[in-house]
Amino acid sequence: MPAVSLPPKENALFKRILRCYEHKQYRNGLKFCKQILSNPKFAEHGETLAMKGLTLNCLGKKEEAYELVRRGLRNDLKSHVCWHVYGLLQRSDKKYDEAIKCYRNALKWDKDNLQILRDLSLLQIQMRDLEGYRETRYQLLQLRPAQRASWIGYAIAYHLLEDYEMAAKILEEFRKTQQTSPDKVDYEYSELLLYQNQVLREAGLYREALEHLCTYEKQICDKLAVEETKGELLLQLCRLEDAADVYRGLQERNPGNWAYYKGLEKALKPANMLERLKIYEEAWTKYPRGLVPRRLPLNFLSGEKFKECLDRFLRMNFSKGCPPVFNTLRSLYRDKEKVAIVEELVVGYETSLKSCRLFNPNDDGKEEPPTTLLWVQYYLAQHYDKIGQPSIALEYINTAIESTPTLIELFLVKAKIYKHAGNIKEAARWMDEAQALDTADRFINSKCAKYVLKANLIKEAEEMCSKFTREGTSAVENLNEMQCMWFQTECAQAYKAMNKFGEALKKCHEIERHFIEITDDQFDFHTYCMRKITLRSYVDLLKLEDVLRQHPFYFKAARIAIEIYLKLHDNPLTDENKEHEADTANMSDKELKKLRNKQRRAQKKAQIEEEKKNAEKEKQQRNQKKKKDDDDEEIGGPKEELIPEKLAKVETPLEEAIKFLTPLKNLVKNKIETHLFAFEIYFRKEKFLLMLQSVKRAFAIDSGHPWLHECMIRLFHSVCESKDLPETVRTVLKQEMNRLFGATNPKNFNETFLKRNSDSLPHRLSAAKMVYYLDSSSQKRAIELATTLDGSLTNRNLQTCMEVLEALCDGSLGDCKEAAEAYRASCHKLFPYALAFMPPGYEEDMKITVNGDSSAETEELANEI
């Protein structure tokens, strides 16, 4: 349909519609739209229909908005306004690629429209279409050469494309246009200079960067950044004496910064260990109270010199009462010789302080206060916990608690000892004791909630967190709103451990949504940062967003989700009782009766709580409805509700797992787990070439990894057993597998692996699993391989032994209940505190509430009687 042009009166109304939209006066805008469209001549005016649709979209009427905009577009396909509006609609729904197409169509009919070009550039940088972004910024520079955003945007485009020299030239041309007095302090100009210097450094133009820094030093506000950059540049240019002077100046500003000492070392280039130590001895004299110059030499010293320096360092810290001293020295624990020296010294302090209140009986000087002994015992508890001796660690921490029962740090360490020893319930109880000593401390509150979650006590953790969340809303909703991902990852892990897969997946998807929101949140900064000239931070933000899903929170959530989806594929939940059946199948009559009693009590308690919560929920929903509506309008519509039951009964669990896997394959390639999870998914999908690809990538990272060995055997065996593979696929597989396995068969390959790693328990477990996988008649040998607890084995730790017990129980080594019970008893002697190895009759009779209350489950006892 040909475009209809509006007469002056209606044209004036149309301009008022645009103004109303810009000022968010949507109701008024709709009135003016109605005035134009009510005239039969203009009832199908494309641009007015499009603007009406855009206005309705802002009021949350999405379907009607799309219908009107499309109708308007059909009536006027050559209108840049209609295409622009359609692009804005797509952008509001986060359909950025579609929005870019719309903007490009709009520019066909009005190629120099500034607003469309600006909107297009925002989407291009959001989607990292850097070539397109550069072209668009060039057009904007040509149209508005007087605007600084035009120059800066064009320079950033070249910077992101790694054409540093061109970016530096553009910035220099722009800088020349800035009229700034040398004596005037201008923050924005200062940031521009620092950004220009960053570009020069990234271009490798170190001499020019140093000259630039010296020329404009007075006009840069961030003096610390100037000095730090100057030090780096002088090192790059091998002007070592000047660099040393700069780093000495930086040390005076902050004697506690490790990087300045490293920089000074690089500048002075000590020839041997004594010269290196001399650098730090000079710093001791200059900064007698500084801990960093006393700590850093411990990294490279050894023998008597190490002992001498460590002695001085520890005495200073223990006398002052410095709680984090163990964390400061933790990195030294990789060296067994240094660990022995630490133990010798600190045990000696404890003995001497008990007898004569001195660090050494031969010392001359005043006696140490009683708190010094306390901090020595506090350190020793952490030391023995670190080296895997929880009984001795508990002796020291209990002695310390007896002497000072009000010090929170002692309870924190006691909780950690129990956690590392495998008794998370006892750990949670002691962390709760710590929290009860200071209920206003948010750190302790969060720590306690985390431990309670690790004990699978989700309700108690929510109660704990509710002390620091907004009133009037549930703690879980508020924590989700605040993107509190540590809580959600721990929740997901707890739900997974309890076989509540739907709830666990809900938490994983919530975390996934947080990362999507963080990615979308950068949109506002594309204009803000150019306006405020915070260019260094802006470029850092863009680089961070590109690798956002490398974050441990995302990796942990993705790992949990993938593991659950794999379980759901192997054992789909077809009805509500399936999980329950899996838990009760192997129970005795007595255990079953006990479980039923517990369930009845839980049901009764849940009903009472449900009634109490219903009234509270209604109030919360009323409070949140308006906020939720506002949020939905802002983010482009309500999100699909995450329903646990629906998530747990998904039809294509492997496809859902791939959604979590894809970002890991792109961004976390250096972690072997990424490729092994990929193998597990493709193995179930019978995608042989993708299985091979995953194995090869994992092999390149760690060819001796136990889990990788299992994957390789399963791949090898599957290829050998498969008869209906296409010839081309079989040819590729044969060629690549010859490189991986050589001329052998799966059984021989497994035996070779076992011989090569016979002294490693994790490797023995993997080999044992594959012995049974390849030949179920070899079960006895497989169990013997896995259950050996010889003291000479490496990695014979709590985690590995728990994995062996799990393999004995889950069928990986066949049906072997007697072997599992015997192994549990053996491990109980090795790890007496670990819950996983407690005797079958063992029950944790205490339940954790908030603020240290503990009570016996008397009702359960009554029912038993």
From Swiss-Prot:
Subcellular localization(s) per the UniProt record: Cytoplasm; Nucleus; Cytoplasm, Perinuclear region
Source domain of life is Eukaryota
Give the compositionally biased regions (Basic and acidic residues): 579-594, 606-621
Q: Which Gene3D superfamilies match?
A: 1.25.40.1010, 1.25.40.1040
What switches on expression, per the entry, is described as: Regulated by NMDA receptor.
**Post-translational modification note:** Acetylated. Cleaved by caspases during apoptosis.
Q: Which GO terms describe its molecular function?
A: N-acetyltransferase activity
| Gene Ontology CC annotation, any one | perinuclear region of cytoplasm
Q: Ranges of Basic residues compositional bias?
A: 595-604
**N6-acetyllysine, modified sites:** K262, K734, K755
Residue interval(s) of motif Bipartite nuclear localization signal: 612-629
In Swiss-Prot or TrEMBL terms, this protein is called N-alpha-acetyltransferase 15, NatA auxiliary subunit
Organism from which the protein derives: Mus musculus
